From Swiss-Prot:
GO terms for biological process: glutaminyl-tRNAGln biosynthesis via transamidation; regulation of translational fidelity; translation. The lineage of its organism: Bacteria, Bacillati, Chloroflexota, Dehalococcoidia, Dehalococcoidales. Allows the formation of correctly charged Asn-tRNA(Asn) or Gln-tRNA(Gln) through the transamidation of misacylated Asp-tRNA(Asn) or Glu-tRNA(Gln) in organisms which lack either or both of asparaginyl-tRNA or glutaminyl-tRNA synthetases. The reaction takes place in the presence of glutamine and ATP through an activated phospho-Asp-tRNA(Asn) or phospho-Glu-tRNA(Gln). It catalyses: L-glutamyl-tRNA(Gln) + L-glutamine + ATP + H2O = L-glutaminyl-tRNA(Gln) + L-glutamate + ADP + phosphate + H(+); L-aspartyl-tRNA(Asn) + L-glutamine + ATP + H2O = L-asparaginyl-tRNA(Asn) + L-glutamate + ADP + phosphate + 2 H(+). It is an enzyme of class 6 (ligase). Heterotrimer of A, B and C subunits. It comes from Dehalococcoides mccartyi (strain ATCC BAA-2266 / KCTC 15142 / 195) (Dehalococcoides ethenogenes (strain 195)). Its EC number is 6.3.5.-. The gene is gatC. This is Aspartyl/glutamyl-tRNA(Asn/Gln) amidotransferase subunit C.
Length: 95
């Protein structure tokens, strides 16, 4: 699949990226090559292969949660630059 200039610009807008002209041309080629690799993978016959997210057996690497004493809520909130009730108030990070 070949991505054209408009495709790259659309993807960049979705990702909120500003691209220079040379970046648009380079990304068009690189993303097209990447999609071609996926097209090859789509042709692989996976009949009879169980879907999996992990190809090798792995035991859980997560540690068990251990409850420990924490700081006093009021002490934490008193150090916050802004607070609203029992919450720390911050600037919006998303539009």
């Amino acid at each position: 699949m070949k991505l054209n200039r408009e495709d790259v610009l659309h993807i960049a807008r979705l990702a909120k990226l500003g691209l220079e002209e040379d970046e648009i041309n380079r990304l068009s080629k690189e993303l097209s090559a990447l999609l071609e690799h996926f097209e090859v993978l789509q042709q692989v016959d996976t009949t009879g292969v169980e879907p999996t997210a992990q190809s090798t057996p792995v035991k859980s690497v997560l540690k068990e949660d251990i409850i420990k004493p924490s700081y006093d809520r009021e002490e934490i909130l008193s150090n916050a630059p802004r607070r609203e009730g029992d919450y720390v108030r911050i600037r919006a990070v998303m539009e």
